[in-house]
């Protein structure tokens, strides 16, 4: 057994040869945060008294959903064969929406632990992140977790892992994050096999930002990995992409609580605080250098994360609009991938059009807005970016159905993604059926073991963002996993379906759909609204239209007073007169009447709560 390190190495004075930078690649729920907890305990960084489950997941929402959203970096001491090592573990998110965060974290490491649940095997997102790691030339340590589970089948999955990355099944480590079995061997293996960082200590300082977090008291905390040179407190630094200069107020390492130090040297991972209040000043993936002696070229491999999914966020109470703006500004401080701009809707009032990396990102942002800022919001149906070319050869970029141009349209192009679905082989038929119904084109399939298949499709992103993932999970009893990456765009026969209430268009319900699906969408929405809008004193027609052509209609029957109640028996002409009079009144009402759509109806129609009833 490796003893605990008697004394930790001092940051800024650590020889790069004894530094090991690694990250853990795993799918959601494969036990990455629990394994990280055990490592923190075994290296003595966190004592057992202050230990809590998922120690590194700071946000409530991360702990509750059991997912990691922001990357964290922790420095841990470990002793092996008489030498003390400084292990820097960079915790990465496992979800497809945050693949940019993953790529930044991987770029800061030399090695990766590929963590797989011994009861479930490899999932699609783990594969995607593994390919990213291999592209970055990282040393991979395969590990099976949860071997204490009764359902675990380590031998089968060890063989699967070994065949995937090349190697011997006996090299696959078996650990249990829960009981701590095998974690020491894993730390020994990390110290032995992961290469030490390489850099020039005398060159101009260059550090890569792999995460930045907003702290309410200290401003932006920037996590960096030093490549060359060193940084010290009170030094003036400059960001290479924005050319902004700041002074380092504090620099140090997380262990896992922030610990100030005398600086950071080659290969070290730590944080710096400059007192800046805006995360956009320290972009993830940017290069930090000293202002006095700047580096000539920035580090490669950085891109701006582009939003893939757009949705409108509107406060239920219009007076909350300024609060929503402040809340989004604050979230933007800690989430550089979020983009938003103000927009107005006739039906919903003032709000923001926001761009997200994917559906989970959208869900997390809306949940954080309601949780951390106490806002009640309506979220419109998610949409993607369309390029619409009209007859006069003008091209319009549409992120919102209301921007879709009228008149003759030559072509509409939509983003396409390459999707990889991993599932047990029994479900291949149902998955193919689902993908074909979503306009997917089969690229190929591969058997990863004797009973697991990877199926690859190209699909329009617009078909995935709405409810594809939920359908996939329900059709495969939760076994399938999905990963997708952008793959350009394609021209499609897309139309805009408008929903009309009493002849007036309600912009919140408009959608851009494929012509073959337009009728189904029209029937679904009109049926849904018929259930939700309260009956009026007059009949209200709900119509779905493409341009001027009505494709579906439902009517909300009028409420009627029983005008014949006072006639006991009596002449039929008397009754007819009263009924005709009522009819006239209703007609007049219909001419001037306006339909108020209650807020609840908007929320329910947009979130699909009434699907059961509407059918």
UniProtKB/Swiss-Prot annotation:
GO terms for biological process: positive regulation of translation. SMART domains: EFG_C. Belongs to the TRAFAC class translation factor GTPase superfamily. Classic translation factor GTPase family. LepA subfamily. Its main location: membrane. Required for accurate and efficient protein synthesis under certain stress conditions. May act as a fidelity factor of the translation reaction, by catalyzing a one-codon backward translocation of tRNAs on improperly translocated ribosomes. Back-translocation proceeds from a post-translocation (POST) complex to a pre-translocation (PRE) complex, thus giving elongation factor G a second chance to translocate the tRNAs correctly. Binds to ribosomes in a GTP-dependent manner. This is Elongation factor 4. The keyword Nucleus does not apply. GO terms for cellular component: plasma membrane. GTP binds at residues 29-34, 145-148. GO terms for molecular function: GTP binding; GTPase activity; ribosome binding; translation elongation factor activity. Residues 17-198 form the tr-type G domain. CDD domains: EF4_II (cd03699), EF4_III (cd16260), LepA (cd01890), lepA_C (cd03709). It is a peripheral membrane protein. It comes from Clavibacter sepedonicus (Clavibacter michiganensis subsp. sepedonicus). Its EC number is 3.6.5.n1. It is found in: Cell membrane. Keywords: Cell membrane, GTP-binding, Hydrolase, Membrane, Nucleotide-binding, Protein biosynthesis. It catalyses: GTP + H2O = GDP + phosphate + H(+). It is an enzyme of class 3 (hydrolase). Pfam families: EFG_C, GTP_EFTU, GTP_EFTU_D2, LepA_C. InterPro entries: EF-4, EFG_III/V, EFG_V-like, EFTu-like_2, G_TR_CS, LepA_C_sf, LepA_CTD, LepA_IV. The keyword Manganese does not apply.
């Amino acid at each position: 057994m490796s003893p605990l390190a008697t004394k930790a190495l001092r940051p800024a004075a650590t020889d790069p040869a004894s530094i090991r930078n690694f990250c853990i690649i795993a799918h959601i729920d494969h036990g990455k945060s629990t394994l990280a907890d055990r490592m923190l305990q075994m290296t003595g960084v966190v004592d057992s008294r202050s230990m809590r489950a998922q120690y590194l997941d700071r946000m409530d929402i991360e702990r509750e959903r059991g997912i990691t959203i922001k990357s964290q970096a922790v420095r841990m001491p470990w002793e092996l064969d008489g030498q003390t090592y400084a292990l820097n573990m960079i915790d990465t998110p496992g979800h497809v929406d945050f693949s940019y965060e993953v790529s930044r974290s991987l770029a800061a490491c030399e090695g990766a632990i590929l963590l797989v649940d011994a009861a479930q095997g490899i999932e699609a997102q783990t594969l995607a992140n593994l390919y990213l790691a291999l592209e970055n030339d990282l040393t991979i340590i395969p590990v099976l977790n949860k071997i204490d589970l009764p359902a675990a089948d380590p031998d089968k999955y060890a063989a699967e892992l070994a065949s995937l990355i090349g190697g011997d099944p006996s090299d696959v480590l078996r650990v249990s994050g829960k009981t701590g079995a095998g974690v020491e061997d894993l730390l020994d293996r990390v110290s032995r096999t992961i290469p030490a960082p390489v850099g020039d200590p005398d060159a101009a300082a260059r550090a890569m930002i792999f995460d930045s977090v907003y702290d309410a008291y200290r401003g932006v905390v920037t996590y960096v990995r030093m490549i060359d040179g060193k940084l010290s407190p009170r030094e003036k630094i400059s960001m290479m992409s924005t050319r902004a200069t700041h002074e380092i107020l504090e620099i140090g390492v997380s262990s896992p609580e922030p610990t100030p130090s005398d600086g950071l040297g080659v290969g070290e991972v730590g944080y710096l605080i400059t007192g800046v209040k805006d995360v956009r000043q320290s972009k993830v993936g940017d290069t930090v250098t000293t202002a006095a002696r700047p580096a000539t070229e920035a580090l490669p491999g950085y891109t701006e994360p582009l939003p893939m999914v757009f949705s409108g966020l509107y406060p239920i109470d219009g007076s909350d609009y300024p609060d929503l703006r402040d809340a989004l500004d604050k979230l933007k401080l800690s989430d550089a991938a979020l983009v938003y701009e103000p927009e107005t809707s006739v039906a919903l009032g003032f709000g923001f059009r926001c761009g997200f990396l994917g559906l989970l990102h959208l869900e997390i942002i809306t949940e954080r807005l309601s949780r951390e800022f106490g806002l009640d919001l309506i979220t419109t149906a998610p949409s993607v970016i369309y390029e619409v070319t009209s007859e006069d050869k003008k091209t319009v970029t549409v992120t919102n159905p209301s921007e879709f141009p009228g008149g003759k349209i030559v072509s509409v192009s939509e983003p396409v993604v390459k999707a990889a679905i991993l599932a047990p082989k029994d479900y291949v038929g149902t998955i193919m059926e689902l993908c074909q119904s979503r306009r997917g084109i089969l690229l190929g399939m591969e058997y990863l073991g004797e009973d697991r298949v990877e199926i690859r499709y190209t699909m329009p992103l617009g078909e995935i963002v709405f409810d594809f993932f939920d359908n996939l999970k329900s059709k495969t009893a939760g076994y399938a996993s999905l990963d997708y990456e952008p793959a350009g765009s394609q021209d499609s026969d897309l139309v805009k379906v408008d929903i009309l209430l009493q002849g007036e268009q309600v912009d919140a319900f408009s959608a851009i759909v494929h012509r073959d699906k337009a009728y189904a969408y029209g029937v679904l929405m009109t049926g849904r609204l018929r259930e939700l809008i309260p009956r009026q004193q007059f009949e209200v027609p709900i119509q779905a239209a493409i341009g001027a052509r009505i494709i579906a209609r439902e009517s909300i029957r009028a409420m009627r007073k029983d005008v014949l109640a006072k006639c006991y028996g009596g002449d039929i002409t008397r009754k007819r007169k009263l009924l005709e009079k009522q009819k006239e009144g209703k007609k007049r009402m219909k001419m001037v009447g306006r339909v108020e759509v209650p807020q609840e109806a908007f929320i329910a129609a947009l979130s699909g709560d009434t699907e059961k009833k509407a059918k």
